[in-house]
Every structure is written in structure tokens, then in C-alpha cells.
Amino acid sequence: PVSKKRVKHWCLRISKYSDRLLEDLNKIDWPEPLKEMQRNWIGKSKGVSLTFEVENSKNKIEVFTTRPDTIFGVSFLTVAPEYSDLHEICNADNRVSIENYIKKVSIKSERDRLADVKIMSGVFSGSYAIHPFSGKKIPIWISDYVLGSYGTGAVMGVPAGDQRDFEFAKKFNLEIPNIFDKINITESAFSDKTGFKLINSEFLDGYDFN
């Protein structure tokens, strides 16, 4: 049987060569999900870290985003199956379904998980996070499209502006709040993210989305 194990390994100073690596990555004829995995591994990103408190808990979930201006479009958080504090943030009533899901996806490699972008899977943690600005309850989900080895192992779901988040929200009947003025997101997310104004975003309403 095949199993995953933690082993010691060398870490190269990739960030020193990030510009060259990212530039040359565009010349490689690889599937886009694998390229995206490499971009994440190279690690050059400009953005901010946001912290969501877990409801009725001392735990917090930190996410990194390159688009903090979409914060009011967040309708769920997704953590990786191998998220470090997973058992602490999950509701005990959902433990069986969570453990079954983790067992199911544990046999897949990271490459397989990124390659299967059209196959959405996940399980509800039974817990909620608190939106840092609106105070709204945000459901916390577990899905194998998030990798524990990249970033914080958690991402904020903005279905209005990300197609992957849009498809995930559609499959699991999650809210899809529209934050883009005069943009129809009934069939797909607005992935261009340029040239329009923000709506339904409290103090960000009216700002240009560039």
C-alpha cells in the first residue's frame, strides 16, 4: 500500500531567483494547474494576510490574499485536509464525515489534486468563522483543492471573483454575493477583476476594482 510520511528534506532559497523562475515558467508547455502550483511554490506574491476568528473558539484562521478588496465577497473559508489545526476548528458532531473525507482524499498526490480541478469535493467542518469586518458567520469547509503545504493551508472563498470558488459554492449551495457593479455572475465568476466598481462592500462601495 502507498502511504504519506513526513521526511527531512533540503529547502532551497527559491525566492532569490523568483523573478527568473516565474518568467521562464511561462515558456513551459505544462497544464495551467501545475504551473499555478509552481508559482505558489516559488512564493512571490504581493498581498495581505487576513485573520478570521472561529466562532465560540480561541482559534483563528489566517489566509493570504492578493485581492483584499474582495473581502466582502467572502462567503466561506476552505482549509486543506492536512490543515494543522483541523481537529481544533471542527465540530465534534461532524467528526465521522470529516474523517471519512480525509481518508478518501489522502491517497491522492498534490499533483492529482491540482489536476482534478473540474472535480469539486469537500465536507463541512460544522464550524463557522467570523468575518473580520461585517461580523457575519462564514462556514468553514474542508477540500482537497487547498493544499496544506502552500501558504497557510486556508483560503477565503470569493465565488463572485474566482471560478473555482464559484463552482464550489454552486455544488454545495453556498452563498454567492455579487460585489461587482453591473456584472452578471449567474453563470460564472467575474475573473477579469478590472475596470468596474465595487458594490455590497460597505466602506469599499464605489471604489474602482482594478
Language-model segment annotations:
Residues 1-3, 66-68, 142-148, 188-191:
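Short, flexible, solvent-exposed loop/turn segments with mixed acidic/basic and small polar residues
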Residues 13, 64, 82, 142-143:
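A secondary-structure boundary/capping signal
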